[in-house]
A protein has these predicted regions:
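Conserved PLP-anchoring active-site segment centered on the Schiff-base-forming lysine
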Residues: 107-128
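N-terminal small-domain helix-loop-helix segment of the aminotransferase-like
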Residues: 2-96, 103
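PLP-dependent aminotransferase class I/II
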Residues: 41, 231-312, 318-319
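PLP-dependent enzyme catalytic core of the Aspartate aminotransferase-like
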Residues: 180, 341-346, 351-386
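Short Gly/Ser/Thr- and Asp/Glu-enriched loop/turn motifs at secondary-structure junctions
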Residues: 26, 88, 320-326, 354-358
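Active-site pre-lysine segment of PLP-dependent enzymes
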Residues: 147-159, 172-241
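Short beta-strands and strand-loop turn motifs
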Residues: 136-140, 163-169, 204-209, 320-322, ...
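Conserved PLP-binding catalytic core of the aspartate aminotransferase-like
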Residues: 297, 301, 310-346, 363
């Protein structure tokens, strides 16, 4: 990085690296980071302000480092959302699911250890591996982005990872992960070896469910498997469907053993009193916070159908199956950066991510999606002719 003086003792493996992050630009239509586009209702804002005001006189003291009340709120929410009641000591909170994932890598990764994923996958995972000196290996998905379970099982046997990390629905493709696939991989992890570990040590399976509330109704969550599988950890967030990205609250559901491992590496008092108060206030309004999820699902399906009717260089656009609030589309964009740039000129920010030839767009308000559609039709013709 040119801005870093050469005389600073930056780690050798970080020299030349750039900070991770999607473009953060002030444009009218932001459809690039998979947020819920609808702001919290005024009643939710009032409750957040009330909760924070109540704890303000205590800010000279450290917060509850075990955040017991918030963990109970996670339990109540999962019982409602996924039909599974977990104990408080089977839950853990952090500053976004990014911190949850980093804590998992800190606890179960490290020098001599390897984590296994399936590409294309979330681009932060190799960053967590790098930051914790953990090896990072990949098993390749099928051409339609569904998980190739046989390849994952082969990689588990060959790599002997300490963690297997899968996203459901997948990011950046949106692909759902069937429960039977999760159960097959869990079974393999329960007997697999971990390189460099002692006899009887087996890998954990981490399922990242950041977007799970957008799944098709009736689809179970991996949380329902935790009671029977102590080697399973499920990461969740309040940033997506719950419309709470600015508060930075993620949480982990897992056996008490896994939670206790994560507690070893957590920073003291890592969740501020303000964060805890705001999250508790949001959970008081779960119905309101999730009220737009069904509409966003409908928007996803309508947008997918519309995209399939569009063409680029006389070929219809491909759209990956999605159980999330975003769509990966294109498939044969030979100038995807040019399409991105032309959309940006028109005030629409999407994401260049995933395999070559594809772009990703998340679901915005009805007005934002209309702007996106109108801009894309114009842009595809311009880029074709260039």
């Amino acid at each position: 990085m040119s801005s870093i003086p050469a005389n600073l003792p930056l780690r050798n493996d970080l020299i030349g690296e750039e900070p991770y992050g999607a473009p953060q630009l002030d444009v009218p239509v932001c459809l690039n980071v998979n947020e819920n586009p609808y702001a919290p209702d005024p009643a939710v804002c009032d409750t957040i302000a009330k909760r924070v005001r109540e704890i303000a006189p205590t800010l000279n003291r450290y917060p509850d480092r075990e955040h017991i009340e918030l963990r109970q709120a996670f339990s109540d929410y999962l019982a409602r959302e996924s039909g599974t009641r977990l104990d408080v000591d089977e839950l853990w909170g952090a500053n976004g699911s990014n911190e949850i994932m980093l804590q998992l890598f800190q606890a179960f990764g490290g020098p001599g250890r390897t984590a296994l994923g399936a590409d294309p996958t979330y681009s932060m995972y190799p960053e967590y591996a790098r930051d914790t000196f953990t090896g990072w290996k990949l098993a390749h998905r099928n051409a339609d982005f569904t998980l190739n379970v046989d390849k994952v099982l082969e990689a588990i046997a060959e790599v002997k990872p300490s963690m297997v990390l899968l996203t459901s629905p997948n990011n950046p493709t949106g692909t759902p992960l069937p429960m039977e696939d999760i159960e097959r991989i869990l079974a393999a992890c329960e007997t697999a070896e971990v390189v460099g570990a002692g006899e009887g040590v087996h890998p954990i399976l981490v399922i990242d469910e950041a977007y799970v509330e957008f799944r098709k109704p009736g689809t179970p969550s991996a949380v329902s498997l935790i009671k029977d599988h102590p080697n399973l950890a499920v990461s969740r967030t309040m940033s997506k469907a719950f419309a709470f990205a600015g508060a930075r609250v993620g949480y982990l559901a897992a056996s008490k053993g896994i939670i206790d491992c994560v507690r070893i590496v957590r920073m003291p008092y890592h969740l501020s009193a303000v964060t805890q108060a705001a999250a508790l206030a949001a959970f008081e309004h779960t119905d309101e916070q999730l009220s737009r999820v069904e509409h966003l699902r409908e928007t996803r399906e309508a947008t997918a159908a519309w995209l399939k009717e569009q063409t680029y260089k006389d070929q219809p656009l491909e759209v990956a199956e999605s159980g999330s609030n975003f769509l990966l589309f294109g498939g044969h964009f030979d100038k995807r950066e040019a399409i991105f740039d032309e959309l940006l000129k028109r005030g629409v920010l999407i994401r260049v991510v995933g395999p070559d030839g594809w772009l990703r767009v998340c679901k915005g308000t009805d007005e934002e999606m209309e702007t996106f559609r109108n801009a894309l039709v114009e842009v595809l013709r311009i880029v074709e002719a260039a």
